[in-house]
């Protein structure tokens, strides 16, 4: 049965949901359309029982943008889509993070969601539509997913909020926020802003949530009309007496451990000992009590001998102990207050050859961040369904396994690394100077050397410091902080600068970055239902206070960007040439510009409007390139010296020398040298470069439209002294 529903979102936007027409062999499928952008989402979940020792939910979300959706061919030699782009990976993460917490606890069936953009009007970004389509597919399926989720994008122009703004409108908007949530609560938030206030952020979330409720209501209607009966799902239930036995051997030790302010590695080792000892003790107890005969007659008692179930409940105890310590005693694992920031240390300029560098350490999280400056040629070309563009500021984040004391694969960039780098990049790019003020391409690389929570926000701080150390005239320093939440019923605590364990065992990971004037980027993931706006407001205010504290420490390390670029950074010089002279500078097949860059040891970039950017580590090379280019685009002038190229050599006449592109002159045999009898072929070869001076210009008597140019080499050298003069000397 085909189900179709149109939802009036206001502002002339109508969202269309359809299911039952495409991909009917999947467990669930749906098509969501906005104007002429359409996405197809499918979901399939395995029905086989997961392995007995599995304790995680293997959810895979894939997002693909088909070039055919926009009537385009893929770029490059191979004309078909290949590995996912960064944009596709970021969109998949956006959908995954909103959906994952809404699956029931203990559901461990391998599940795959594939979102495909099948039509793009190049006005609407399909990422949030993919989230809606995925939720619709789940609601129509038999998979135990009961609470619909919707995602929306919110922008703002001239103070007015926009729902699902066009890509072109986002260029004028002072915010680009993606919000994911159910009808009752917000579960995901991500976006970039132009230094907005906390109150403005709350206003945007509330505006988006009103639209989310409408879309969720339509999904419930879809479920009632065409939804399949849900699978029977029974999570593992541990008997009360088994829970008591586990608590008896584990709870006291875990509580004692929680109140000790230990380093990450030491805490992990001691916690692992508790798990091993407690699990072994419980297994010994029940193996002695439950014989094979008893187990054969009572197969339900197998749970008592299930080591995975035992460890899962020990984990629940560990989680409860930490949360209760925070809620009851306002005490954290490392002994800090709820709003206290870990100690921060900063070192600048420690990498000699980098154009800017910073080592930012906050507690047990450390980022080594470097800045590299380049020319427009170094910009990243992004090939998407929308217009291709050059990206002149980029931040790359690396998370090697040694940063958490592990051995791991060193291969391609992970989705997590792409996501964290993108968040840090969005946080800083709002303060990056415009191209006309600072015509460099900037690449910031954050290598995480240690990690115990909030490494992406350390990358924001380190990236800002490296940029300032490198002399990038940013508008204002940016700092980032990760906030956490512990909530039990009506009791809750908001945590500043969370540890890895507080993220893992807590209910929220809310990263907020910004300047002294406002927020520039945020990312929030919620693991619980029922998060009200009072908690979000408290988290944002506490994050603001933490951000001010971090910015103060950063200001003590470096107050403003350095006035000069680093020793090894390229110096950029910009000049303007006539558009019709661009060909003269480039030369046939690029030979002129290649020769220029080689001779002056520079990089030269020419824009379509005639803007020439010259990059050189030395001012001498840059000046030489400027002089050469100005000469190339100027008209021939008597008295000027040119670095000409010999085009023809004739012993009876002299040589024909090209002094400017398409301009040749005669170097007469009499102007070669002060020495008589010199043969041109003895000192000149075709293709040779030689300095000549233009000594005369005259109209060609045979063709007045042409000009004859007379050149000289000998006037550039001193004539030899006479014999009498030599003797007197």
Curated annotation (Swiss-Prot):
Boundaries of every KH domain copy:
570-633
Magnesium keyword on record: yes
RNA-binding among keywords: yes
What reaction is this protein's catalytic activity? RNA(n+1) + phosphate = RNA(n) + a ribonucleoside 5'-diphosphate
Write out the similarity annotation: Belongs to the polyribonucleotide nucleotidyltransferase family.
Summarizing the function annotation, the protein's role is:
Involved in mRNA degradation. Catalyzes the phosphorolysis of single-stranded polyribonucleotides processively in the 3'- to 5'-direction.
Which protein are we looking at? Polyribonucleotide nucleotidyltransferase
Source organism of the structure: Chloroherpeton thalassium (strain ATCC 35110 / GB-78)
What is the gene called? pnp
């Amino acid at each position: 049965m085909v189900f179709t529903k149109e939802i009036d979102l206001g502002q002339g936007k109508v969202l269309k949901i359809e299911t039952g027409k495409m991909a009917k062999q999947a467990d669930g499928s749906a098509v969501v359309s906005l104007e002429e952008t359409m996405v197809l989402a499918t979901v399939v979940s395995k029905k086989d029982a997961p392995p007995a020792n599995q304790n995680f939910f293997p959810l895979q979300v894939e997002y693909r943008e088909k070039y055919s959706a926009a009537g385009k061919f893929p770029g490059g030699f191979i004309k078909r889509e290949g590995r996912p782009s960064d944009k596709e990976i970021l969109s998949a993460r956006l959908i995954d993070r909103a959906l994952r917490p809404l699956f029931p606890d203990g559901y461990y069936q391998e599940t795959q969601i594939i979102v495909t953009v099948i039509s793009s009007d190049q006005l609407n970004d399909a990422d949030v539509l993919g989230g809606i389509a995925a939720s619709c597919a789940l609601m129509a399926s038999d998979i135990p997913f009961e609470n619909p989720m919707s995602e929306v994008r919110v922008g703002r122009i001239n103070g007015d909020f926009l729902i699902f703004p066009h890509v072109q409108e986002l260029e004028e908007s002072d915010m680009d926020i993606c919000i994911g949530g159910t009808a009752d609560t917000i579960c995901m938030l991500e976006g970039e802003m132009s230094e907005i206030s906390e109150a403005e952020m709350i206003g945007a979330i509330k505006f988006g949530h009103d639209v989310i409720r409408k879309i969720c209501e339509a999904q419930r209607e879809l479920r009632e009309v065409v939804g399949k009966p849900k699978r029977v799902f029974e999570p593992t239930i541990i008997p009360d007496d088994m829970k008591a036995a586990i608590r008896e051997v584990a709870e006291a030790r875990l509580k004692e451990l929680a109140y000790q302010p230990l380093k990450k590695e030491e805490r992990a080792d001691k916690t692992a000992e508790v798990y091993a000892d407690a699990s072994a003790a419980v297994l010994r107890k029940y193996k002695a009590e439950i014989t094979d005969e008893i187990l054969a007659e009572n197969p339900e008692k197998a749970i008592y001998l299930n080591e995975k179930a035992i460890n899962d409940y020990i984990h629940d105890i560990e989680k409860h102990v930490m949360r209760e310590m925070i809620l009851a005693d306002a005490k954290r694992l490392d002994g800090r207050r709820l709003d206290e920031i870990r100690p921060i240390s900063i070192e600048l300029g420690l990498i000699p050859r980098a154009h800017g560098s910073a080592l930012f350490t906050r507690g047990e999280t450390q980022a080594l961040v470097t800045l590299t400056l380049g020319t427009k040629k170094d910009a990243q070309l992004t090939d998407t369904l929308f217009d291709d563009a050059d990206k002149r500021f980029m931040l790359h984040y690396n998370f090697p396994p040694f940063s958490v004391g592990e051995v791991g694969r060193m291969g391609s960039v992970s989705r997590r690394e792409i996501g964290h780098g993108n968040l840090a990049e969005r946080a800083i790019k709002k303060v990056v100077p415009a191209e006309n003020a600072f015509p460099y391409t900037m690449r910031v690389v954050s290598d995480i050397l240690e990690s115990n929570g909030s490494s992406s926000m350390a990358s924001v701080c380190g990236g800002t410091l490296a940029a300032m150390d490198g002399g990038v005239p940013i508008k204002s320093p940016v700092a980032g902080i990760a906030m956490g939440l512990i909530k039990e019923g009506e009791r809750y605590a908001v945590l500043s600068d969370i540890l890895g364990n507080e993220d893992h065992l807590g209910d929220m990971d809310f990263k907020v970055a910004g300047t002294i004037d406002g927020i520039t980027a945020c990312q929030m993931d919620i693991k619980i239902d029922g998060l009200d706006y009072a908690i979000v407001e408290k988290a944002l205010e506490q994050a603001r206070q933490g951000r001010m504290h971090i910015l103060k420490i950063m200001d003590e390390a470096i107050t403003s960007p350095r006035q000069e670029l680093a020793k090894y950074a390229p110096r950029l010089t910009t000049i303007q040439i006539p558009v019709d002279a661009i060909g003269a500078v480039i030369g046939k097949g690029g030979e002129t510009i290649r020769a220029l860059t080689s001779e002056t040891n520079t990089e030269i970039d020419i824009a379509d409007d005639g803007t020439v950017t010259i990059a050189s580590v030395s001012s001498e090379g840059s000046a030489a390139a400027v002089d050469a280019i100005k000469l190339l685009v100027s008209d021939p002038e008597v008295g000027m010296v040119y670095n000409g190229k010999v085009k023809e050599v004739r012993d009876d006449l002299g040589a024909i020398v090209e002094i400017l592109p398409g301009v040749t002159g005669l170097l007469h045999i009499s102007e070669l040298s002060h020495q008589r009898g010199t043969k041109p072929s003895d000192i000149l070869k075709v293709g040779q470069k030689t300095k000549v001076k233009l000594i005369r210009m005259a109209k060609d008597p045979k063709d007045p439209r042409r000009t004859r140019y007379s050149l000289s080499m000998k006037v550039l050298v001193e004539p030899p002294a006479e014999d009498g003069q030599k003797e007197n000397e």
